[in-house]
Structure formats: C-alpha cells, structure tokens
C-alpha cells in the first residue's frame, strides 16, 4: 500500500499521535476528531488549548451535551494527560516506513469505508505493513476460531478458505495460533505467487489474506508466527490500530475483533470454546449487520462448545459446506451494512449458563475495563511506580490509585514499598 510518508501532512501526524494517546474504544476521543478534525482534536486532548464554546456545541452534536459532556471531557483530559508529553508521531511514522509500512487514515482514498460502520468505535487510523490494499468488505470474509484448533477445525478451515480465495475473496483473520493461523496458511497456499496490485490503481489487487493484529507492527506477535506473518505481509497486509512498540493486551485483542468484523462482509466461526474471542468477533459482526456463519462440530468437543452456543442463542447461519460460507457475503462490491447501532462497540451477549465442560474461571473474570487495563499494565517480575502505570494503562492518576486498591483486595496486585507489580491472584 502506498501512502505519503515524506513530509507527512498535518492530519496524518495528528492521527499518528492520537493512536498512541488514546486506547481503542475511547469513543469521546473519536467523537472529538469527528467534530473538530484530527489536528484541533489533538491540541485539545493533549491540553495544549481549551475547548471553546463553539467547539463544545460541535462536540455536543456527536457526544451529547450538558453537564454529562463536561464530566466526560474532564475525565478524558485526566485520562489522556499521562501520555500527552510522550508523543512523537514523526518518529512512529518513520519507524513503520523503514519497515515498509505506514499509517492509513480516513482522509486517504484507500481508507476502507466499511470501518465507518463502527461509528464512534471507528479506529483513528490503521498502521499497516504490506503492499496490498484493503478490499471492499463485500470481497472479504473473516474466518476466526479457537487457538486450540483440532485437526477437524484445521481441515474445515482449509476447505472454506481455499474455496474463498479461489473465488477472489480476501480472508481476514487475527494472526493468532489455531484457526487464525490455519486460515492465513490456507489462503497463502490457495494463491501461490500472488502479489498485490498497486494501491493507486483504484480497484483492490488480488490480496489473499489480511491479518489484523492487537499490537504494534514493528514486531510479530505471536513470535511463533513470525514466518507466517511475514508471508502474509508479502502477499497481503498486516493491519493494526496500535502504534509501533505497543504491546498486545487482552483489552486490545477484544477491541481488535471489531476491526476484523467491520472489514469483512461476513464472519465464519469454525471452532470456538464456550468462552472465546471468536464469539466476541461474531457479536461485533451481528451488531454491524454482517452475516455470521457457524460451523458445527462434535457435541463432545469443547472446541466446538462456543459454536453450538452461537447456533442456539444468536441469529447466525449454519455452515455445513464450504460453499455456504461464500453465500454469507453480500452481493455487489459496495459497502456492507448500515451505520453501527449505538451498541456497536458492545456486541450482543449470549446467555451465561455454563455447560458441563465450561472453562475454569480466570482471576481476571469480572474486572471492569479500567481494572483490566491496570492489571495488564502491571509487570509480573519487577515493580513499577504509579506514574509509569498511568502511561501504560492510559488512565488518570486518581483512577489508577483507586483501581490498584481494588486489585490488591482481589489478590491481583502487590505493593512493594512505593511501587506495584502483578500478583498471582
């Protein structure tokens, strides 16, 4: 993909900075950019200037008005402040350019319009590595599933993906172990020797697969998939809303899933455990009006328990043949679905009844978003001070202090003199 990199324009620099300043899912930041533009929004979010009355009125059209907006804005400023002094967007842009990548922004002609369906949950930009373009959603099929894939799951994935790629459809997944990796491999195998066309040619080149990652693209994650992700990059694209150096966390993985859903015309879940990120992706797809297909499996297999749960409880379609997966895609080459519903960033949940083979409870189950952000920012071996945690978690100092107290009560955080580290729980 080709986008400007020498002397980047103001919008690209601003959006590069914003991707480091705010965490995915920060709707107020996205609403400020939509109302005031990226450059002005950056100045306000970093505290370089104050929100003027006329700007408050513009923001109110996107984010609501009155005292509630004032409280949200004050909380946002406190949340963004710890990272505001550490922004260097030019450095980030140069770092990705040296790796053959860059930052795709909504102001670019190549920006995938399907992401606009996310509304206030839309990404502020997409960092990329690779030479392909993002196809319209009608020509992209997401294939997702469990990290603990069975031989049955890999076989089904290969059949679905091979048929899709041979039909000229791009396969989108998350680059993880299990079904994701099987999907990318099958796409590459089905399109040997393919090299993407130029980004400025108007129509998308023959991109067989796209991996949407949860961390910065300057390193490959998981490390065991470095060779695979390099192959995906050479034949297709690596995408992430996170800037160089950003670590993948559970919070970022969950928000990454909405991008997989939005970039695709439909989602196929091949295998999923009772609690699975693949179900989260399916929920995002349903909230965006995308079709979701689910592959059934043996009733004795925990790897298919989540699939059967979706088939029972969600408005999904059974996929019993590879051809049925392609039938999920909308006709035509235009954008898919309508504007995101107000719950687009919070996909529909399914009933919580646990089956006999339900996964064991995790120490982090039931944590709020803020608690999860702080918990994931805590190192395991070495203790860090609270100021460092405010930067890593992207939260205000008072919020981090309050959250640390709650985590300590749950046995998830341990104070070492005036520093903190992760506890085993």
Predicted regions and their residues:
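Short, small/acidic-rich helices and loops at N termini and domain boundaries
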Residues: 1-108, 398, 410-419, 423-425
């Amino acid at each position: 993909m080709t986008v400007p990199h020498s002397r980047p324009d103001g919008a690209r620099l601003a959006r590069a900075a914003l991707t480091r300043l705010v965490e995915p899912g920060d709707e107020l930041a996205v609403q400020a950019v939509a109302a005031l533009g990226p450059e002005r929004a950056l100045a306000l979010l970093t505290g370089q200037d104050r929100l003027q009355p006329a700007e408050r009125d513009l923001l109110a059209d996107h984010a609501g008005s009155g005292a509630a907006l004032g409280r949200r804005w004050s909380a946002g400023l406190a949340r963004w402040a710890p990272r505001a002094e550490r922004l260097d967007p030019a450095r980030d842009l140069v770092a990705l350019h040296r790796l053959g990548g860059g930052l795709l922004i909504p102001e670019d002609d190549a920006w995938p319009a399907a992401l606009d369906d996310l509304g206030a949950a839309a990404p502020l930009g997409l960092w990329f590595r690779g030479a392909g373009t993002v196809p319209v959603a009608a020509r992209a099929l997401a294939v997702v599933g469990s990290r603990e894939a069975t031989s049955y799951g890999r076989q089904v994935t290969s059949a679905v993906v091979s048929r899709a790629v041979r039909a000229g459809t791009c396969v989108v997944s998350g680059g993880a172990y299990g079904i994701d990796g099987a999907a990318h491999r099958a796409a590459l195998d089905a399109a040997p020797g393919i090299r993407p066309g130029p980004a400025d040619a108007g129509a998308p080149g023959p991109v067989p697969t796209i991996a949407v990652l949860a961390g910065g693209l300057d390193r490959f994650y998981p490390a065991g998939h470095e060779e695979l992700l390099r192959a995906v990059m050479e034949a297709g694209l690596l995408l992430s809303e996170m800037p160089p150096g950003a670590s993948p966390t559970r919070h970022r993985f969950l928000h990454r899933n909405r991008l997989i859903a939005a970039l695709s015309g439909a989602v196929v879940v091949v295998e999923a455990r009772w609690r699975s990120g693949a179900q989260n992706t399916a929920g995002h797809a349903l909230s965006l009006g995308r079709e979701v297909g689910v592959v059934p499996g043996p009733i004795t297999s925990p790897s298919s328990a989540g699939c059967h749960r979706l088939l029972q409880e969600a408005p999904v379609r059974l996929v019993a043949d590879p051809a049925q997966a392609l039938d999920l895609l909308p006709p035509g080459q235009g954008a898919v679905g309508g504007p995101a519903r107000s719950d687009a960033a919070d996909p529909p949940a399914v009933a919580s009844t646990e089956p006999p083979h339900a996964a064991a409870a995790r120490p982090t189950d039931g944590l709020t978003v803020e608690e999860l952000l702080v918990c994931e920012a805590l190192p395991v071996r070495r203790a860090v001070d609270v100021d460092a945690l405010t930067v890593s978690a992207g939260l205000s100092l008072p919020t981090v202090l309050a959250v640390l107290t709650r985590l300590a009560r749950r046995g998830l955080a341990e104070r070492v003199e005036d520093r903190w580290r992760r506890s085993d729980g």
